[in-house]
Amino acid sequence: MNERGDYGDKADGWFAALDDSIAPVAADLRSLVRKAVPDATECIKWGTPNYEKDGAICAIRSGKEFVALQFGPIGTSLEDPDGLLEGTGKAMRHVKIRAKTDLKKQLFSSWIKQAATANLK
């Protein structure tokens, strides 16, 4: 049984509860994921919105002053020519976005699509 109580919930409440300083960034990321993989499912897992289609694609996490787009289990294999992805784990990587101007929509969309495609292999 899930001890968190939110596992599998819809993500609307999570987005609504965000601080006004980061909510617009999170909303843009959510929209980006939905456009990149329209048939991905969105639900709360581990307290944060997760996106799946035939396996994990990505998650959106929040910090005090940023929103992170997180990739695992293929985070380390994503093409990252600008070195934006952070993390030291075996597979997971994330990028922190502090303002809407930091959104690299084309690159992030590419990563999201790479993650979704990796699940088909």
At which residue positions do the language-model features occur?
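Charge-dense, helix-prone N-terminal extensions
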Residues: 1-121
